[in-house]
């Protein structure tokens, strides 16, 4: 039966089935999809449950021991479980350079140049290797943001689960809610803000030590400051994630490209293409002129195999050839037919799977930089008035420093001579 000893019953049941000799097959065809969480707090709550459950399995039914699993299966299961123990190492990474800058403690007893010569090539090589292997599905550097957002919250439950694996209960993740206004979740972002302030103190002390400290430590101070700035960019991205965007759709839209037709009440028929749909409406593009009016009733014709179905709709908006349709009340049979024509199609999620652009590490790094600065801009935008004064002063200071950066003068456009003879010379 289903394993109930842990809060991640699906992974635990899968492990037990493999131990008993059952085999599983991976099908690279998306069969279904589920809603994501609407808020960062709900997302973190879901990941806390996942992290606790996987560590519980690691303690109660460790895949590295026991019988029934092949070596590859043991490694894969152990990797999936140990991944959720990244909270404490990530927090150490975000504060490690501060040990030297603030406390004068050497976490790595080696010259700064030697550390850079060993660490930088390894980081570049690891990033390029991951991009080559997983570039079609994952983008470089984004896991840094993901782990930073979760680190503070998954570290305590995973540590407790290692000590007492029976502690914890199953919590259902709420989905499908609405977000009326854009806002910053100050409660969730509080740990990131504390880490930002701590790293800013480290930068200030590092600059002071760079100017007035011993000469033999200048290079080490410089490397530590660069490390702190990298951490500040990652923390800025974590702050940007805590900004909740407005979510007013009650039904999630699914992208798709499907031929269809729309019939007006007077009998005129127009071919169109469905480019997105939900349980309450559709977005279509009419092939040609959109000869429908907003508020007009019509019938949408969809096909499944050789069978054709008609659904009553109302034109909600018209923007050129782009038309938004709202489904009118359907009978039970019509609703079943609509689901069969849309959500239940075998190729429903094919477009979603193939729509990801391939990873380009430098572009991903640039996106991370933009996200980090955007996080601090949102922090200033949504902060109390008394704090905004400080942010404005810092922004003015950064702009003043940036004004000293040399700029390449614009090249004057060449002037054409009016004399053809001179032009030939």
Where are these regions (language model features)?
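Structured alpha-helical
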Residues: 183-425
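Non-transmembrane catalytic domains and loops of membrane-associated enzymes and transporters
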Residues: 1-155, 415-425
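Residue-level signal for alpha-helical context at structural boundaries
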Residues: 58, 65-66, 159, 166-167, ...
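Short membrane-interface loop/juxtamembrane segments of multi-pass integral membrane proteins
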Residues: 171-183
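Membrane-embedded multi-pass helical conduit in multi-pass membrane proteins
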Residues: 83-168, 184-245
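Single-residue recognition of alpha-helix boundary sites
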Residues: 20-21, 64, 101, 180, ...
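Alpha-helix boundary/capping detector
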Residues: 43-44, 73-77, 167, 174-175, ...
């Amino acid at each position: 039966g289903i394993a109930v000893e842990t809060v991640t019953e699906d992974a635990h049941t899968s492990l037990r089935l493999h131990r008993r000799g059952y085999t599983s097959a991976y099908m690279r065809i998306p069969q279904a999809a589920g809603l994501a969480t609407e808020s960062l707090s709900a997302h973190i709550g879901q990941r806390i449950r996942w992290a606790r459950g996987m560590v519980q399995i690691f303690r109660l039914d460790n895949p590295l021991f026991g019988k029934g699993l092949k070596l590859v299966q043991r490694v894969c299961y152990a990797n999936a479980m140990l991944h959720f123990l990244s909270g404490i190492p990530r927090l150490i990474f975000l504060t490690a350079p501060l040990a030297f800058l603030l406390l004068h403690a050497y976490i790595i007893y080696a010259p700064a140049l030697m550390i850079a010569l060993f660490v930088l090539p390894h980081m570049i090589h690891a990033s390029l290797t991951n991009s080559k292997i997983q570039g079609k599905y994952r983008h470089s550097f984004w896991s840094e943001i993901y782990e930073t957002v979760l680190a503070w919250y998954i570290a305590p439950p995973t540590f407790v689960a290692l000590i007492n694996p029976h502690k914890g209960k199953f919590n259902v993740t709420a989905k499908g809610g609405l977000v009326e206004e854009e806002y910053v979740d100050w409660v969730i972002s509080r740990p990131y803000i504390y880490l930002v302030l701590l790293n800013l103190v480290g930068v200030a002390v590092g600059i002071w030590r760079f100017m007035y400290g011993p000469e033999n430590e200048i290079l080490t101070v410089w490397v530590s400051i660069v490390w702190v700035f990298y951490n500040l960019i990652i923390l800025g991205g974590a702050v940007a994630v805590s900004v909740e965007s407005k979510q007013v759709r009650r039904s999630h839209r699914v992208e798709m490209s499907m031929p269809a037709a729309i019939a007006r009440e007077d009998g005129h028929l127009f071919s169109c293409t469905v480019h997105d749909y939900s349980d309450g409406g559709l977005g279509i593009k009419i092939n040609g002129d959109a000869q429908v009016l907003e508020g007009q009733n019509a019938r949408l014709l969809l096909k499944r195999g050789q069978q054709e179905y008609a659904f009553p709709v109302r034109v909600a908006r018209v923007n050129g050839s782009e038309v938004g349709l709202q489904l009118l009340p359907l009978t039970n049979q019509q609703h079943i037919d609509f689901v069969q024509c849309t959500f239940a199609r075998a190729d429903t999620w094919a477009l979603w799977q193939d729509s990801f652009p391939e990873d380009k590490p430098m572009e991903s790094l640039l996106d991370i930089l933009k996200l980090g600065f955007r996080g601090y801009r949102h922090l200033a935008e949504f902060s109390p008035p008394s704090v905004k004064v400080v942010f404005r002063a810092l922004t003015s200071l950064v702009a003043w420093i940036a004004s000293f950066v040399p700029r390449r003068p614009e090249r004057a456009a060449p002037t054409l001579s009016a004399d053809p003879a001179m032009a030939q010379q």
